């Protein structure tokens, strides 16, 4: 995949600034590039047993050794004392009441693990919820259209978790993903606007474990970041994945000038109202504070 975009990285201190790399003219400018190791068409299965409910009713904390956290605070961090930007006044705007409200997947249905890693997306007619290793599809009135189903029943790769669901409104398609413990990102893109129908399923192998993946929709691809060192930002060929093309690629690069407190995950910008013009760079956001980095 040949991208000629300017890769821009935005990092937040107390103010926001943008760091732009030179225009990339070929794949050789990126540290990682690979074609999907597997592509197939799959149909969701909603009549298989879900994860067993915890007999003791307890919630379990899932420890992830891949997540690197340093709980250190710098004595030289500014400002000293209170935050001068802290707002002490209540908003004058009244809160809006929910349009509709219903119970989704609960802890027992989703395996009882903590954190639950919830993700949800809404489309014109559906709401898709993912929690831990389970997902379920509802209509927009809150009626369950399917039984809860394991991620593995659709995505394969076991039920590793860290699920993400997006509705790509520009293509009227659904995007569901989880990682696998084989250093893979597994992505399903629906073939129609119906999330209960068939999906194009892609498996992308990476150089190391893609912890805490975060995705976005952009004009030239699906962008994704991961909590890992080395190549930690990627772009998937969106057009090919929507078409079910088995030659779809993912390219990756290392985010430059990133000082972290041990947590590498960055948030990619996603298009909301309209798709940016072709050639518009994507922006990656990272909150950086001198108290820890």
Q: Could you say what each language-model-derived stretch is?
A:
Residues 1-25:
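Bacterial Sec-dependent N-terminal signal peptides
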Residues 22-293:
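C-terminal PAP-associated
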């Amino acid at each position: 995949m040949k991208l000629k975009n300017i890769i821009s990285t935005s990092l937040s201190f107390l103010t926001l600034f943008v760091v732009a790399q030179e225009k990339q003219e070929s794949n050789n400018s990126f540290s990682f590039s690979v074609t999907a190791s597997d592509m197939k068409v799959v149909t969701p299965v909603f009549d298989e047993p879900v994860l067993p409910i915890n007999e003791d009713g307890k919630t379990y904390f899932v420890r992830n050794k891949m997540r690197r956290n340093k709980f250190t605070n710098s004595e030289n961090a500014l400002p000293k004392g209170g935050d001068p930007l802290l707002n002490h006044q209540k908003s004058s705007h009244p809160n809006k009441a929910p349009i509709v409200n219903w119970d989704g997947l609960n802890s027992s249905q989703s395996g009882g693990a903590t954190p639950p890693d919830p993700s949800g997306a809404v489309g014109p007619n559906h709401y898709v919820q993912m929690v831990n290793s389970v997902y379920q599809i509802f209509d927009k009135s809150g009626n369950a259209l399917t039984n809860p189903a394991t991620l593995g029943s659709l995505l394969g790769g076991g039920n590793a978790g860290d699920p993400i669901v997006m509705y790509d409104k520009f293509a009227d398609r659904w995007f569901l993903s989880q990682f696998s413990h084989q250093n893979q990102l597994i992505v399903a893109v629906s073939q129609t606007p119906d999330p209960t129908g068939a999906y194009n399923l892609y498996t992308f192998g990476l150089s190391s474990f893609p912890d805490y993946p975060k995705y976005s929709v952009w004009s030239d691809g699906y962008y994704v970041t991961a909590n890992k060192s080395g190549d930690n930002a990627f772009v998937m060929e969106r057009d090919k994945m929507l078409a079910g093309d088995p030659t779809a690629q993912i390219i990756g690069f290392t985010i430059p000038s990133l000082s972290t407190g041990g947590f590498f995950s960055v948030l990619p910008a996603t298009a909301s109202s309209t798709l940016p013009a072709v050639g518009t760079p994507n922006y990656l956001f990272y909150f950086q504070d001198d108290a820890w980095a």
